[in-house]
Amino acid sequence: MSDNYNYPLDINWSTDEITSVLHFLNQVEKAYESKVDANQLLESYRVFKEIVTSKSQEKQIDREFEKSSGYSTYRAVQKAKEVEKGYFSLGR
């Protein structure tokens, strides 16, 4: 995994939408690199889903992000739902 990777962003998104998607992806990064609050990750995911309403686009973003970073948005969200409250880590 490289420390320098690209985020899967859509050029048609507004600045606010890009900021919200980046916030979600940063929460996923925190889950792998340190610890993240499950509620904060799920809240950022909720906002992300308001922007990315298509399941196929969500899966594409997850694939692209995991390919470039090694981090899975799907696994992070599943773990946050499992934990519900408090902090968790997916660090290796």
UniProtKB/Swiss-Prot annotation:
Annotated organism of origin: Streptococcus uberis (strain ATCC BAA-854 / 0140J)
InterPro entries (UniProt xref): BH2638-like_sf, UPF0223
UniProt similarity note: Belongs to the UPF0223 family.
Gene3D superfamilies, per database record: BH2638-like (1.10.220.80)
Protein name according to UniProt: UPF0223 protein SUB0967
